[in-house]
From Swiss-Prot:
The a and c carboxylates of cobyrinate and Ni-sirohydrochlorin are activated for nucleophilic attack via formation of a phosphorylated intermediate by ATP. CbiA catalyzes first the amidation of the c-carboxylate, and then that of the a-carboxylate. Its cofactor is Mg(2+). This is Cobyrinate a,c-diamide synthase. Keywords: ATP-binding, Cobalamin biosynthesis, Glutamine amidotransferase, Ligase, Magnesium, Methanogenesis, Nucleotide-binding. It comes from Methanosphaera stadtmanae (strain ATCC 43021 / DSM 3091 / JCM 11832 / MCB-3). Disulfide bonds: none annotated. Belongs to the CobB/CbiA family.
């Protein structure tokens, strides 16, 4: 399977612009399967726009090496891709530890035995770009850095000087350089880039990135690197449990401006377990569709709180669904939506607490949670991994730890100690999870949906 990892020396070097531009440029003549390293919903939305193919996340905190390879294989096979292009996260070696590579781009490159392209912010650099390249190559001999892309060069003259330095002093070929251009930058929000689903101009912007890549990057050289990818180790592990619910169920999944943070494989795990996904909009539709369960992902409900609050028939239908004991699982933005209010505006009110946006980040971490109560997705006395990233908080005014399904071993959750409000058969948590670290997610949730029809 032909592939490449596009990584950077750090955050803010232009990985998403360059990776998405490469995906767009190559998609004109080839089938591209995009991937993103780490727990990220926003960058993949740009990949989807560029390729017309759902991007998948690869993460060594969530996944074993065998699961990383399986997820990569699943993506390449399902899309019949010619090339797999993997956008890294932060710097090549950044993970959860200063001394190992768990959660890093380098761990993904090694699990997939993939060639790597290093993106360098070349502003005011010439020979130092060569030094950076040498350092990144020297830190781990198992990382195969096959090329460099120079971003933010001042001029053609600057590019040629820096290219010569990297190729002669670091013995690494330079595939091209991108000059500084503020017109190609993306709008930011508190969780990062604005999701592509919201931006009407995104298709034009992605097209511009593709043109920029066609004009400045040696795509033939890049494809040659991918064509010569070394074999992937033939050791795979399943992403979800082979146990399968025999009964057919229908599961509602909101997907609109407010809610659009979902991992592709979570939805596939539900479908594997005979669930039919019914997509709907809490903003635009009048009520919940006729279903057996509800899965509310994250997103930006705080940005669309007025629209959500005005849709009273939808709010009432979801509250009644919870009161009727049908299973609901909600993550982050879904948790806020199920609270009494968001920034004082009425919401579903399954949980009698107020949620609000804050100026400072409240939770930004991989998480480890211990399950203290049975719930629609997990059984008591198990432990699972996830992640949280939120500039919001829920003002929990209760005093009973039994209100929560999870006690936190790593991360903040709702109270700093607990997460996962549980009422009726409704679970709402700040933790986002991936089926790779929760292999029974699809089975448990669909089984609960069937048992509580």
């Amino acid at each position: 399977m032909k592939r490449v990892v596009l990584t950077g020396t750090g955050s803010g070097v232009g990985k998403t612009t360059i990776a998405t531009g490469i995906m767009k440029a190559l998609s004109d003549e080839h089938k591209i399967q995009p991937f993103k390293v780490g727990p990220d919903y926003i960058d993949p939305s740009y990949h989807n726009c560029a390729t017309g193919v759902s991007s998948r996340n690869l993460d060594s905190f969530f996944m074993s090496d065998g699961q990383i390879r399986q997820s990569f294989k699943n993506g390449m096979t399902s899309s019949h891709a010619d090339y797999g292009i993997i956008e890294g996260v932060r710097g090549l070696y950044e993970g959860i530890s200063p001394t190992n590579d768990i959660g890093s781009t380098s761990s993904i490159a090694k699990a997939l035995n993939s060639p790597v392209i290093l993106i360098i912010n070349s502003r005011s650099l010439v020979r130092s770009a060569a030094a950076m390249t040498l350092g990144f190559k020297a830190l781990d001999s198992r990382i195969d850095i096959e090329g460099v892309i120079l971003n933010n060069v001042k001029s053609q003259k600057h590019y040629l000087k820096t290219k010569e330095a990297v190729e002669k002093l670091a013995n690494t070929r330079v595939l091209g350089g991108i000059e500084r251009d503020n017109s190609i930058s993306m709008e930011q929000r508190h969780l990062g880039l604005i999701p592509a689903v919201e931006q009407e101009r995104i298709s034009g912007l992605v097209e511009k990135w593709g043109e920029l890549i066609r004009e400045n990057i040696d795509l033939d050289a890049l494809m040659e690197i991918m064509d010569n990818s070394n074999p992937i180790i033939n050791e795979y592990e399943p992403i979800w449990s082979p146990n399968k619910t025999k009964h057919k169920t229908r599961i509602a999944v909101p997907f609109d401006e407010a809610f659009n943070f979902y991992y592709k494989e979570n939805l596939e795990a539900l479908e594997y377990n005979n669930a039919k996904i019914e997509y709907f909009s809490p903003i635009h539709d009048e009520q919940l569709p006729s279903v057996d369960a509800l899965y509310i992902g994250g997103g930006y409900p705080e940005i669309f709180k007025k629209e959500l609050s005005k849709n009273t028939t939808m709010l009432e239908s979801i509250k009644e669904f919870s009161q009727d004991n049908h299973p609901i699982y909600a993550e982050c933005g879904g948790l806020m939506y199920l609270c009494k209010t968001i920034d004082s505006l009425p919401m579903v009110d399954v949980f009698p607490y107020h949620s609000m946006l804050t100026k400072r980040v409240q939770g930004l971490s991989y998480t480890i949670a211990h399950v203290q109560r049975d719930n629609p997705i997990l059984k008591k006395n198990t432990t699972y991994h996830g992640h949280e990233f939120h500039y919001s908080k829920v003002e929990y005014t209760g005093s009973n730890s039994n209100d929560f399904a999870f006690s936190m071993r790593r991360g903040v959750g709702i109270t700093g100690k607990y997460d996962g409000l549980l009422k009726n058969n409704t679970l709402a948590s700040y933790i986002h999870t991936h089926t790779a670290c929760l292999p029974d997610f699809g089975y448990n949730f669909t089984q609960s949906a069937y048992e509580n029809k």
